[in-house]
């Protein structure tokens, strides 16, 4: 585990090639992962293990392009096993998708209540997430944000890879409805059914 939160702590035995602390922690993370996998390969359990690497959140890269910068929520997910054929997927997903994706790789049947999908078997038409006071819904071309404090809706066209503010119209309604229905469902599970009961 490593953090991109200051203060940046690099072990004294590690000698980075770069001078910027933010780059040094990336160098150290890369080195530490290499060391970890070199040692793991020597273990008898290596070929029977699925390794999952992911970030919990991103970091502001460049200028904030909107009220909730996408770089805060754009995180990597890497799944590795010596028994899995390498491939790269560039479709988006969420942290809720990790569990069903791993269970799918293991061919394990499961009862699932966390709104995730198996990213290797289906593509998400859209995704929602929350951060601070914002609710966000997005797909490949549109970004919908709702600020709870100001009760303001913010809408962007992201189809060309850049965020362009556009007026709210009917094309954003599926994102809005999906995002709020997911939040309401989660709240219902927590308050009414109680998530502890789902574990039984």
Where are the language model's segments positioned?
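Solvent-exposed soluble domains appended to multi-pass membrane proteins
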Residues: 1-200
